[in-house]
Curated annotation (Swiss-Prot):
Its EC number is 2.7.7.8. Its cofactor is Mg(2+). This is Polyribonucleotide nucleotidyltransferase. It is an enzyme of class 2 (transferase). It is found in: Cytoplasm. CDD domains: KH-I_PNPase, RNase_PH_PNPase_1, RNase_PH_PNPase_2, S1_PNPase.
Amino acid sequence: MNPVIKTFQFGQSTVTLETGRIARQATGAVLVTVDNDVTVLVTVVGAKQADPGKGFFPLSVHYQEKTYAAGKIPGGFFKREGRPSEKETLTSRLIDRPIRPLFPEGFMNEVQVVCTVVSTSKKTDPDIAAMIGTSAALAISGIPFEGPIGAARVAFHESTGYLLNPTYEQLAASSLDMVVAGTSDAVLMVESEAQELTEDQMLGAVLFAHDEFQAVIQAVKELAAEAGKPTWDWKPAVANTELFNAIRAEFGEAVSQGYTITVKADRYARLGELRDQAVAKFSGEEGQPSASEVKEIFGEIEYRTVRENIVNGKPRIDGRDNKTVRPLNIEVGVLPKTHGSALFTRGETQALVVATLGTARDAQLLDTLEGEKKDPFMLHYNFPPFSVGECGRMGGAGRREIGHGRLARRSVQAMLPAADVFPYTIRVVSEITESNGSSSMASVCGASLALMDAGVPMKAPVAGIAMGLVKEGDKFAVLTDILGDEDHLGDMDFKVAGTAKGVTALQMDIKINGITEEIMEIALGQALEARLNILGQMNQVIGQSRTELSANAPTMIAMKIDTDKIRDVIGKGGATIRAICEETKASIDIEDDGSIKIFGETKEAADAAKQRILGITAEAEIGKIYVGKVERIVDFGAFVNILPGKDGLVHISMLSDARVEKVTDILKEGQEVEVLVLDVDNRGRIKLSIKDVPAAKASGV
C-alpha cells in the first residue's frame, strides 16, 4: 500500500484527502477528514461498458450515515441501519445535482457514488465532506468527468457577515444556511434557506462560497495529479448529421408549429404524432437507423426549436413573454373538515394544500447522529401520476418528492411562529393535482395560504417562483415561471421563495458553464418582481392569518404549576394523569419546569382537564369555606375531602356548638358538608370546622 495524502486549509478547518489505503478495488476511493471531527469514505465505481438498453445516464449517489460513527447502536428489533433517512436522501440529491451535468453528453456507462460517514463528533454536518470526497474520488477514477468541483456551506450574521462552513451551533444563530457547489469558473448548485435576506445578500453568499471553495478544487487537482488513474479512452458516438438534416427538413416546420399549441396535452399529442411519423419514415427495415436513433434526433430538433425561438425573442411555448406569470386562481377553505386548506392554480400547475394542527406528542421523532430530536413542523409533497395525465407507480415518497417537500418547507419555516407562542405541531401536505412546471413553488404558495387559513399566526405570507434560462453563445433569456418543457430544455432551474421583505429559500441548478453574476442578478430581479405580483394576488384572497383557529382544530390551553406539584399531577406510576386523560379525552404534556400544555378535541374537554389539574395543585386557603365530602369517620372527628387529594380533619369539638357524643350523630360517610379552613400546619395538615361556617358567612367570607 502506498497511500497518497493531501492536506489543505479550508477556511478555519483542516481537510485531509487520503487515497490508496481503503477500498482499493473501487474505481476511485477517497477518505476525507475534516478537523478530526468528521470522516467520510467516498467510493466511485464506473462500468466499463454502457448498457445498450438504457437511454439515459445511470448515475446513482448514495449517502449513508452509520450510527457507529457517533458511537451509537441503531434502535429497532434488528439493530442495524435500515432504509435511508430523509436526511440521507436529501444529501444524496445534494451531491448528485452538481456532478450530473459534468459527465460528457452521450456518456451512458453506469456510475455509482457511495458516501459513508464513518466518524463524527456531531459538531458539523458531514455533507460538505461527502461532496469534497465525491469530487476527489471522481477526479482520480479516470471516469470522464469535467470536474473537479468544490463545495461550501455559508452562514450569515448581520454583525459579522458571511461565515464559511459553520458548526451546528453557529448555524442555529445564523439567518442563512446555504450550500454552494461548482467548478473553478462556474456555480452549478445552490441550496439554501434564509430569514428574509435581500437578493443582494443571497447573491453575495453564492459568490463568497465560490471564492472560498477554490482551495478545495486546487487540492483535488493536486491529488489527481499524483494518484489519478489514466482517463478512460471514451469517445461520444459520431453524430449522424445527414439524418438530422433530413428529419429537420421534413419535420422542422411542423415541430415549430407544434410548439405554438398552448395546451400541454394537445401539444404533447401533436408532437407524439410527428415523432411517430418520423420513425415510420426514417427508421430502416434493417434497423439502420433504429427507431430509438430517430427519436433521439427528433428530440434534438425539439430542443433546438424551443431554444432558438426563446433567444430570438419569439413568444414562449404558451404565448407569454419572458417576464409574465401564468394566470392565477387562488381559493382557501376549500375542504370543510380540515383545519386549513388552499387550492393554488398557476396555469396548468395546481396544488391542493392542507394544514393540520396536532399536539406536542404528534411531533416527528428524528433519530440522527446528533441524537434524538423532535420536529414540530412537517411539510409533505405528493406527486401522483394523474397530475401529468399518466398511469404510474403509487407508493411511498421518492427522492424527488422528498426533495421538493424539503424545499417548500424551507421556504415557509422562517415565517412560522415560535413554539412558545404557538405550541402546536403542524403538518402541511401538498397534493399536486396538475403539473406543468414549478409544482414545488405552487406548494410554497399553497402552504402559506393553508397555514393562514388554519389560523397559524404567520409572520408574513410567502410565495415562490421558478425561473429558467436559455443561453446560446452570447445570447441569453431569463424566463419567469417556467413550464415543464422549458425546465427540461433550458440551462437553469432557479427557484426563489420569500416574503415582500426578503428571500426565505433559494435553490439553483445549472446545467452549463458560463452563468455570470449578471445573469444571476437578472434572475433574482425578475423573481422578486414575480414574487411581489403573486403575493399581491394571494393577499386579495387572504392577507393575514385568521384570528381564530378552525373549529375543527384541537383546543390548546397552556398553564404552569409549581414544580413541587408535578408529581401530584402525574400520580403514582402515572395513574392520576392517565385518569384525567381518559375521563376528559384530552392529552396533557408536562415539562420539567412545570409548563403544561393541554390539548382537547373540543374546548370543553380541554377546560375539564384544566380544572382537574387546578384542583390537584390548589392549596387550601385559611379562612375559606369549601364544600367537601366526608371520606372517613373516626372517634375523634371526620376527615373531609375539600380538594382533589386533600383531606382535612373536622375535630369532634368543631362539629357543633352543642356537645356531640358521637360523630355519627352529626355526619355520615359520603355526606356533603360546608367546612371552614381554620389552619394548615407546616406538614400540610388541614384543620377544619363546621360549627364556625355560619359566623364566617355572616362576616362575608
